[in-house]
Structures are given as C-alpha cells and as structure tokens.
Amino acid sequence: MAKRQGTRTVILENGVYIGSYSAVVGPKESDGPLGKYFDKTFQDEFLGQDSFEKAESKLQQISVETTLRKADLTPDGVNIIFAGDLLNQCIGSAYGLREMQIPFVGLYGACSTMALGLIMASTAVEAGSAEKAIAVTSSHFCSSERQFRFPLEYGGQRPPTAQWTVTGSGSVLLSQSLKGVKVNSYTIGKIVDLEITDMNNMGAAMAPRDVKIRPYPINEGLVFFYTQIQYLRGFRALSNYFKPYKFH
C-alpha cells in the first residue's frame, strides 16, 4: 500500500509500472531535436478537423489509441483514465475520449496536468481500485492562444515574453505488470507566489529559475528521475540533464 514519508512524499510499495506510452505532435515539434522520437507527427495543424479545438481532441484520441495499440489492449481493458488539457471544461479531453467509454476523470492543472494525472493514476493502481489506468494530456498552440491570449484571426502582435505552447499529446498506461519503468514515489509541491506580473509570460510562473531541492529534516523522501527516465524512448536524448535529487 502507499505510505507517506515526510510531509509531501508518498512511497508506492506495491509497484506501479509504465507499461506503454506514446507522444504525438504537430509540425513545429516534429522539426525540433526530439522529432525522430515521437510516435506520430503531423504537418497539418488542423489534423483534418474544422477547428483547432477539434484538432487538439484528435491529438489526444490518437495518443491514447497509440498507447493502447502498443500494449495490445482495447479501451475495454482500461479501468480508468485521468485526462486534462488547457481548455474550458477540458473539452479537448472530453470530446477526444468520449467514444472510448473508459471511466473518465477530468483534471485541470495547467502545465502540471501530466504530473497530476500520473499521481492519480499511480495511486489508483497502487490502491487496487484499478488494474490498468491511463494518464493523458494535450495542448495546441492555436487553441491555447484563443484561450489565454488572442485568437490568431485577431492578428495581434505577440509580445517577446509570450511562450509557444506545444501542439501535441502524451499518454501513459500504468499497471502492476512488473515490467517497464517503475513509479516508486511522488512528491507534491506547494503553492508559491513568484510575483510574476506579466500576464503574457505564463511560462515564468511555471518554470522558476531556481528550485529548492534540499529536503526538510521532517521529509527524507527520495525521488529518482535519472534511473527511470533514461530508459524511456523519446527521453533518451535528455537523460544527461536528469539527476537524482532529494525533494522537500
């Protein structure tokens, strides 16, 4: 069973494993240094749909379908799915996954949605309430611009501090199958006001220039990134950037 260690860390004692995963992206991402590692890439930002929001839903649908296919599973074999995106009412997830009829939990954590989904799915598998669970998220540059800044049709000038939101979707399948990358534990952070006043510079609030990694005396939770992530295809090129740290 799950065991709390310190104030923020939870140890998963039964063993939860990432049995399958996928990442699908749009044209800008496919042109980057990780382009060859993605499962699928698309040059059409609409993905054949008639709106950017529908295109994002399609990305999420394709990601989950790819993850299931790589695990030789159908939607009926999944007990629960934790999904989220950046749009109102999580419509990217709701419309993208509705045909699969998997028990659905909608999440909204902005850029932390994937981590939040992994935490929730891992906890469900650890507790035995799900044999197989999926965590998935998505975003789309064009739908995010409409949601948070200005629609592209408006033709507004982008400020230099405005980041470029990813067009893509990623999903992972978690189970106790005793194979794949193991999720040992997770550490939940706290709310910190970084006093970012530029409303266009949303990335600065999500990626602070420094992070406290020294553990509190009351929390000795140890979270290893390097030893697990280095084996994931798609993250192999980034493995040198990950080190084992103690988090508070």
PLM regions with names:
Residues 1-53, 150-217, 223-225, 241-247:
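Condensing-enzyme catalytic core mediating Claisen C-C bond formation in acyl metabolism
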Residues 89-91, 141-146, 182, 192-196, ...:
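Short, well-ordered, mixed-charge alpha-helical segments that flank or form enzyme active sites
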Residues 108-135, 174:
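Active-site-proximal alpha-helical scaffold in enzymes
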Residues 7-11, 73-74, 96-99, 113, ...:
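Solvent-exposed alpha-helices and their adjacent loops that cap or buttress functional pockets
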Residues 19, 83-84, 133-139, 174:
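Short beta-strand segments
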Residues 29-31, 92-94, 144-149, 238:
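Short acidic, glycine/serine/threonine-rich loops at helix termini
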Residues 24, 83-89, 139-140, 179:
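Short glycine-enriched loops at secondary-structure junctions
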